[in-house]
């Protein structure tokens, strides 16, 4: 897995430079050249005395003047590159065009890119599409907050605030920060690339496997580079804890809540407690996947009458889990096997499987658990 660290912003060429060591350089260059006639130079440079990669795009093409959405789209569409790379490139270009269309209030097909566009943007987009597909980055990448810089940037429309309007539009939903450097550190193309990748905000602990730096063009007091980590994610789950207190609810309703939330929650607890004025109550706690936390919170409020549910970000390190099947009285019983560092730490039978055997053969459930334990020891 890769983690993007745009502590000094992100641009198209910074992304290519940071990722170039992780892909086949010759295939990368040939893919871009199938779209646009350019020379591509890959070299090592130093930024703030730190060694970094630099990908330079040098024009020698007759179609370098393509700078409208329609023109660039046609250049990419008519190229003979791998279809999935072509689709990704067109999607990144579309993100750029739709942002420009919105901030300038023009039809997307008539968008003129002005500062972006021309040979370098085409190469950046196609190169990024190549990298994204070869490394499977889409929806499978992490990032840290993006440094957008500060101050103003000069355009043909005049001075515009940083981030530029199109960049700000693209960055919606991503975590950014302003620094004390009065420069445009994050460009529209860089924003469109990271927006398309749709990374998750990096949280928790990781093991670093490799580090790469992609140099930018600016010379700043800050290291002007995009840093990329290839990391091994310590096995965690993206989960949240929902919690609320209720003091006017019956045990029957709580039992029904179990049924309603079956299949939606990882775990559900009802904890007896006392509230103000010594009122007996329950604390309801549910562990859920982040993407359905709001849905589950609303179910809890609707079913219990609670006026609010607290949401806590939590981390949970988990063992590797797998199922294996054993035979008991010629019936199949699934065992959930837990491992840490390839060492088996637990083997637990599925309750429903044992319950069915207990009913079928008239054997106490507790005796079946004992037989399972003996069977595991023998195996």
UniProtKB/Swiss-Prot annotation:
The keyword Secreted does not apply. GO terms for molecular function: lyase activity; nickel cation binding. Pfam families: Ni_insertion. NCBIfam families: nickel pincer cofactor biosynthesis protein LarC. This is Putative nickel insertion protein. Keywords: Nickel. InterPro entries: Ni_insertion. Belongs to the LarC family.
């Amino acid at each position: 897995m890769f983690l993007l660290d745009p502590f000094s912003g992100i641009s198209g060429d910074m992304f290519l430079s940071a990722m170039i060591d992780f892909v086949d350089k010759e295939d990368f260059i040939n893919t871009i050249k199938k779209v646009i006639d350019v020379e591509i130079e890959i070299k090592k440079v130093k930024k703030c005395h730190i060694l970094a990669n630099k990908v330079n795009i040098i024009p020698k093409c007759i179609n370098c003047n393509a700078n409208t959405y329609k023109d660039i789209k046609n250049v990419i569409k008519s190229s003979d590159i791998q279809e999935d790379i072509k689709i990704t490139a067109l999607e990144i270009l579309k993100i750029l065009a739709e942002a420009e269309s919105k901030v300038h209030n023009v039809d997307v097909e008539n968008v003129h890119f002005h500062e972006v566009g021309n040979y370098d943007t085409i190469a950046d987009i196609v190169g990024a599409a190549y990298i994204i597909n070869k490394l499977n980055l889409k929806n499978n990448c992490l990032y840290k907050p993006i440094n957008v810089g500060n101050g103003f940037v000069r355009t043909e429309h005049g001075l515009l605030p940083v981030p530029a309007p199109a960049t700000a539009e693209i960055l919606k939903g991503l975590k950014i920060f302003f620094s004390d450097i009065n420069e445009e550190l994050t460009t529209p193309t860089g924003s469109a690339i990271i927006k398309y990748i749709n990374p998750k905000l990096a949280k928790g602990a990781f093991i670093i496997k490799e580090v790469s730096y992609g140099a930018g063009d600016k010379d700043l007091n800050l290291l002007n580079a995009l840093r990329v980590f290839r990391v091994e994610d310590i096995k965690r789950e993206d989960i949240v804890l929902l919690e609320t207190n209720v003091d006017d609810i019956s045990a029957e309703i709580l039992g029904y809540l179990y049924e309603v939330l079956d299949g939606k929650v990882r775990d559900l607890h009802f904890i007896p407690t006392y509230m103000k004025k010594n009122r007996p109550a329950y604390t309801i706690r549910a562990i859920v996947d982040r993407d359905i936390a709001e849905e589950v919170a609303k179910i809890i409020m609707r079913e219990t009458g609670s006026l609010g549910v607290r949401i806590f970000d939590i981390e949970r390190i988990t063992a590797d889990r797998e199922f294996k099947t054993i035979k008991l009285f010629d019936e199949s019983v699934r065992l959930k096997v837990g491992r840490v560092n390839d060492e088996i730490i637990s083997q637990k039978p599925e309750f429903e499987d044992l319950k069915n055997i207990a009913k079928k053969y008239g054997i106490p459930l507790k005796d079946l658990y004992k037989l399972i334990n003996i069977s595991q020891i023998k195996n």
